[in-house]
Amino acid sequence: MLKVFLVEDESIVREGLKKNIPWQEYGYQFMGEASDGEMALPMIRKIRPDVLITDIKMPFMDGLALSQIVTQ
């Protein structure tokens, strides 16, 4: 199973994605979530997910900056 981590600042969207996608049915394991890139980064470094789903516009650290740091 591939490990998935979700980063989204809108709690309604984050909860909707987390609860309405049958992750295991598609071969994914939902590993965690964060509301912005700054909060997500230490969690991502610890969990080391295979897939990162992130919003682009977020406070503190946006999804583009987060993706750039994670891929370095």
List where the protein language model places each region:
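Two-component/phosphorelay signaling modules centered on CheY-like receiver
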Residues: E10-G32
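Conserved phosphotransfer cores of two-component systems
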Residues: R45-R48, I69-Q72
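Active-site residues of response regulator receiver
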Residues: D55
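Acidic catalytic/metal-coordinating carboxylates
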Residues: D36-M39, D62-A65
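Receiver (REC) domain active-site loop signature in two-component systems and cognate sites
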Residues: M58
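Non-catalytic signal-transmission and effector/linker regions of two-component phosphorelay proteins
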Residues: M1-K3
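Alpha-helical elements of the RecA-like P-loop NTPase motor core of helicases
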Residues: E15, L41-P42
